[in-house]
Amino acid sequence: MHIKDQLKQLKPYQPGKPIEEVKKEYQLDKIVKLASNENPFGCSTHAREAIQAELEHLAIYPDGYSASLRTELAEFLQVNEKQLIFGNGSDELVQIIARAFLDQHTNTVIPSPSFPQYRHNAIIEQAEIREVSLLDGGAHDLKGMLDEIDENTKVVWVCNPNNPTGNHLSESELVAFLDQVPAHVLVVLDEAYVEYVRAEDYPNSLSLLHSYQNVIVLRTFSKAYGLAALRVGYGIASEELITAIEPAREPFNTSRIAQAAARAAIKDQDFIQSCRQKNEAGLKQYQEFADRFGLFIYPSQTNFVLIDFKRDADELFHALLKKGYIVRSGKVLGFPTSLRITVGTMEQNAEILSTLADLLQGIRA
């Protein structure tokens, strides 16, 4: 058997360490996972009720077109139903876009470091990858990205807010960028963390779709909506673009349970508002910690923080594991002296920050 050569240079995506694995490895009873940017407050009670009701229909295939969810979401977003595409998480939409646009004769422009699946899927499609380093402070180098675009560029990825830094692009910055991107290039606006954004200058990306036919916006129910286990994401673009890429989508790619939970979750915006407020309070806890120890914390519009500790990230990562805290080492994210930490509950934040304070004071002693 011959496997595609490009697969030999890839490894499967490595998420944060599983809780049970850490319990077993370190003989711990309590584990706090702050690695995968999950919602520490769970999901809406309405979503739980919808999941329970859907258990009666597990023998029946889901609606492959997600018609009911499509109608609910289109009304909520104030877009045409035909402007939507659904995926098994927004990860699948990244894969669909790469499959639809990229091949060995094309190139794609990617900010770096950013979400690794952009690069991963481009490699599978044998496209040339043009990575543009982030600016100091973690923002996209939009000028550098524009400089990499040529006649063979098919897709440009913009992660806003960016993962793993949490930085955001303003509407004026994004519009100035889009004005200079050639019409033959698809611009993907990955807005996985949009529900957490507080910045007043954050782009109204859906309104931009009217002016830029070469833009698709990706969002997910995995983060603020707390439905990560169910895997449901969505894309919004022009009807023509959605129609063109739909054939690359797998049939029945979002489950009955996922569709039902997402429909219910959309209707509970009080839950989202509550999570946003609690997350903002949590971000302040981390900012105060960084100020106390003179550490640089990247300006986050998400539910995670990236903190530069100016020391080997893996050492701190393993020290926290031994204490029962799972975070992400910046070494695997392109920031070798930083940790990415999900904002948890007030209590979780206080506990891990107390542990980090003890570790830092021990190192400095």
From Swiss-Prot:
Q: Which residues carry this modification: N6-(pyridoxal phosphate)lysine?
A: K223
The EC number(s) this enzyme carries: 2.6.1.9
Gene3D superfamilies attached to this UniProt entry: Aspartate Aminotransferase, domain 1, Type I PLP-dependent aspartate aminotransferase-like (Major domain)
**Keyword Protein transport among record annotations:** no
Keyword list (alphabetical) reads:
Amino-acid biosynthesis, Aminotransferase, Histidine biosynthesis, Pyridoxal phosphate, Transferase
For this protein, what is any one GO molecular function term? histidinol-phosphate transaminase activity
Q: Does the keyword Lyase apply?
A: no
Instruction: Tell me the cofactors it needs.
Output: pyridoxal 5'-phosphate
**One record GO biological process:** L-histidine biosynthetic process
Give the catalytic activity: L-histidinol phosphate + 2-oxoglutarate = 3-(imidazol-4-yl)-2-oxopropyl phosphate + L-glutamate
Name the pathway: Amino-acid biosynthesis; L-histidine biosynthesis; L-histidine from 5-phospho-alpha-D-ribose 1-diphosphate: step 7/9
Q: Which InterPro entries does the record match to this protein?
A: Aminotrans_II_pyridoxalP_BS, Aminotransferase_I/II_large, HisP_aminotrans, HistidinolP_aminotransfase, PyrdxlP-dep_Trfase, PyrdxlP-dep_Trfase_major, PyrdxlP-dep_Trfase_small
Q: Name one Pfam family in it.
A: Aminotran_1_2
Q: List the disulfide bonds.
A: none
Belongs to which family? Belongs to the class-II pyridoxal-phosphate-dependent aminotransferase family. Histidinol-phosphate aminotransferase subfamily.
Quaternary structure, per UniProt, is: Homodimer.
Matching entries from NCBIfam families are given as: hisC
HAMAP family in the record: HisC_aminotrans_2
Q: What is this protein called?
A: Histidinol-phosphate aminotransferase
